[in-house]
Structure formats: C-alpha cells, structure tokens
Amino acid sequence: MRLPSPLVVALAALTLGGVPSAAAQTMEPMSYSNAPIGLNFLIAGYSHQWGNVLADPSLPVRDVEASVDAGNLAYSRIIDVWGQSGSLAMVVPYAWLSASGEVFEQARSTSRTGLADTSMRLSVNLYGAPALSLQEFAKYQQDTIVGVSLFVTAPTGQYDPNRLINIGTNRWSLKPELGVSKALGAWTLEAAAGVTFYTDNDAFAGNGVRRQDPLYSVQAHAIYNLNPTLWAALDGTYYTGGRTTVNGVIGDDLQRNSRWGGTLAYSIDRLNSLKLYYSSGLAARTGTDFQIVGLAWQHRWGLGL
C-alpha cells in the first residue's frame, strides 16, 4: 500500500539540528498532518551548514566563519492521544565543526567533533486529525488541522567550559508551539508559532553564568503536491528575542532575524522516502546568517506495510 503524499517525509525535518543556532531556526513543513496510529519511522539525515553559524555576541569572538557537517538519527511513532493522532520523536545528532575568526583581535581557527544536543518532541493534533487505523486512513481527506507540540532539548552535546566554541550548549531548552494546517486542493498552507525557554549555562567560558531570554518564532509554509509521491514547499521563518546576560551584563544581541528556504520530498516506495532541503538567512540583526543544505532518508514500518 502506497501512503498519500502528505505523509512522505513529514517527520524528516527533525534531523535539521546540528548546532545550537541552527536548531533554534529550523523550518519544518508538514509538522501538523495525520498518519495511521502505530506507524514507526526511522530517519537518517545529513546536513552541511556554512557561514556565520556560531554567532554569539556574548563571546570575545568576531568575524566568525564556520562550517558544520552533521549526521542525525531519529525515531518517531504515531500515537493515539484521547482519540486524536499524535507523535513521539527523538533525535540524536553528531557534528563535525570547523571555525575561524578573531579572538581578542588575534586570528584563530579550531575544530570540534562530537555529539550535539539530543532533541525530543511530543506532538498532538487537537482538531481535524483523528486517530485512524491504516484502513480508515486510506479514506481520510485533510481539511483543517490544529495541533500543538512540545520540543525539549537536553544538554547531551560535547561541551568544554574552557573552550569558547562548543558543539553542545550545556543547558536545557523547552519550546511549546501551536500549529495550523489547511488543505486547499493540491496546496497545503501551514503556520506555527512558538516560544523557546532556556535554562542557565552555569559553566560559560570558564565559570561564568549565561542566561538567555525567551526566543519567539513564527514559521509558514506553502506546500504543493505535484503528484501522489512528490511534494515541494516554500518555507519562511521570523524570530525575535533571545537577548543574553553574562555574569549580570546584558548583551546587545536582541534577535530580529528571518530565514527562507525550500523543501522537496519524494516517496521511493511504500516504505522509503527522501527529502532535500535548503535554507538561507534573509535578514539578520545579530549574525547567525548562514546557509544549510541537507538530505534525509525515512523508513517506515508497522501495521503490515
């Protein structure tokens, strides 16, 4: 049985994260869609990021140019939540980072390799996406879906307090999000708004304490189903807030940044899908003006597929 196009790689955007700045700015088309209860997904992804990836005005580092290659492994399962569909997902990324810039006006370069922070997500569709069996799902037609998600990022990534640049963040983050998806013939329009809260990093650049205000974000997607096995999306996001305080000193790093990108997803067969994505900075007040390109493979199983 070949599943409808909206399900193709709908969860692969989970593998976008590789470094903190990128993880905070990911764009995820098809995040709020329906799928049969009991399906499992294994996702393997690779991404390459380059540019001002590691911008952090609270560090004595300027003119940073970096490249990050990240491999990601994710698992997700579709679940029944009080008669509505939902999903549980977990992503473990591994990153290879190289960077150059000026530290206290001296040219420096460095490289890092190791685990990045692990992410988890719970999503629940509140309206328009009932819990369905595989047979029931074959007759399902999307109209309007309203859902919520909770993203949690754990400080499992490589972190050395004596280094200015790290792969991990040494803090937790929590992001609740509200999303809406509307099907209009071959088109699907999707929008989501969320806010990310951060715990303190109490081992910042030695024994310093770094705090960060909440980061508010909105994203929108225009998705077009080219045929039953292929869809494409135009993606955009805007985020603001996130000002930092280091050892009581408030930073001049309020974010008002935007990004745009595109996504192409293809269903190879009833069990395997591929997704290609790209995004770039559109306007950046405090740096983080980088580009990212990635490829994700998704395998699904369960329900006798």
Question: What do the predicted segments below correspond to?
Answer:
Residues 38, 65-72, 113-120, 144, ...:
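Residues that define the transmembrane beta-barrel architecture of outer-membrane proteins
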